[in-house]
Amino acid sequence: MDIRLHHLSIGYRRGPVVARDINITILGGRLTCLIGDNGIGKSTLLRTLSGFQPKVGGEIWLGSREADSLSQRERSRIISIVLTQRPEMGGLTVHDLVGMGRSPYTGFWGNLAARDELAVRQSLVETGAWPLRDRKIDSLSDGERQKVMIARALAQETPIILLDEPTAFLDFHSRIDTLRLLSRLAHTMDKTILLSTHDLQLAAELADLLLLLSPDGLRPVDPATISQDIRQRIQD
C-alpha cells in the first residue's frame, strides 16, 4: 500500500511548523529510511502519519483512503508503529506481548481466537523470535526485544509499518540484523516500511530509498550525493 502526501505540513497547531508542503509517494513493498538533522521532525512526521499527532495542513492518503476519513480502528488495521521508547512490560511473555498486536481485531483485553494465534505464530516465525516465545520480556537482550516489537507490529497484519529509530540502543550486529529483517519483510510480504534513523551507512546499504527531511519538505536522495556536512550532522 502506497503512502501519498499532498502539501502536508507537520508541527504543532499552537507552535512552530516543523516542515511544510511535503509532496511525495512512498511505495509499498520497499524499505524506506527517513533521515535528517537531529530535532528536524522525523518523529513528528511518523506520529502524524500514524494519527498520534494531528497534521497542520495538507492530505495523507493511505492507498485509496484519505487518512482523515478513517476511524481509529480502521487506521490501526492499516498502520502499525514501533516507537523508540522501550515498553515496561517485563512481566509479560513474548507470546503475550506479540498477541497484543491483535487488539485491533479482538479489543485490548480480548481473547485470542485460532486466527489470532496463527497470526502470532507466523509473526514470531517470520522475525526469528519463535524460540523466545515463552521468555519474559525483561529477560531479553535489546536486540531480542526489538525483534519481538517488530513481531508484534507484524501480528497486527497491517500493510504499513512505521518505526522510530529501531536501531537505537542496539549493538552493531543487532543493527544490521534489524535492518536486514525489515528489508526482507518489506520485499517478501509486500509491506510498506518507513523508519527514521541516524545510521546513515547501514540505511544507505540496505534501504530501497532514503528520504531527507528538512524545513523545506521531504525529498528522495542518492546516498552517494549526500554532502559530508549532512552526513556529519545526521550521524552526530
Language-model features, listed with the residues they occupy:
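Helix-to-loop junction immediately C-terminal to a conserved catalytic motif
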Residues: 50
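Conserved beta-strand-loop-alpha-helix hinge in the C-terminal portion
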Residues: 213-236
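Conserved ABC transporter NBD signature motif
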Residues: 58-66, 75
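The feature captures the beta-strand-to-loop junction immediately N-terminal to the Walker
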Residues: 35-37
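Catalytic Walker B motif of ABC-type/P-loop ATPase nucleotide-binding domains
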Residues: 161-165
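Conserved ABC ATPase signature
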Residues: 136-140
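A short, flexible loop at the N-terminus of ABC-type nucleotide-binding domains that lies
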Residues: 1-2, 9-21, 89
